[in-house]
Regions:
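Structural detector for internal amphipathic alpha-helices that build alpha-solenoid repeat scaffolds
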Residues: 4-25, 44-57, 80-94
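Amphipathic alpha-helical scaffolding segments comprising HEAT/armadillo-like alpha-solenoid repeats
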Residues: 3, 24-36, 57-69, 92-107
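Hydrophobic/aromatic-rich structural module bridging two neighboring secondary-structure elements via a short loop
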Residues: 59-87
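Short, well-structured alpha-helical interface segments that form or flank functional binding sites
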Residues: 44-47, 62, 77, 100
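Short inter-helical turns and helix N-cap capping residues of alpha-solenoid HEAT/ARM repeat scaffolds
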Residues: 38-42, 74-76
């Protein structure tokens, strides 16, 4: 499946849990969701990423550095959702990326 097909499939899928299932099978779904979260402040993408990070944190963890970019964008709602994703990823934080952002968390 190419990137355009994946993007269209996400848009056409009404049920978020179906997008979560798709993300578990198709590697391009997570970067597309992160891009939507960062560039469009897409709440649906944020919610799907929260679900994905709860269910399969190892799939989302490689994108940790991209996800934390949302902390400095948009509003408190986006920051709150981003912290939820990060909290879910901490159980698999084998590269200790938390150390880079923990001061930002405690200052919030």
């Amino acid at each position: 499946m190419n990137i355009n097909e994946v993007y269209l499939r996400i848009i056409e899928t009404e049920n978020d849990s179906d997008v979560v299932k798709l993300a578990k099978k198709e590697v391009m779904v997570i970067p597309i969701l992160i891009n939507a979260m960062l560039d469009e402040n897409n709440c649906r993408a944020q919610n799907i990423l929260i679900d994905l990070s709860e269910q399969t944190p190892l799939l989302v963890y490689p994108y940790f550095q991209y996800i934390i970019q949302a902390l400095d964008r948009y509003d408190n709602f986006t920051a709150w959702n981003t912290w939820r994703i990060i909290a879910n990823l901490l159980i698999v934080d084998y590269l200790e990326m938390w150390e880079e952002i923990k001061d930002k968390y405690f200052a919030a």
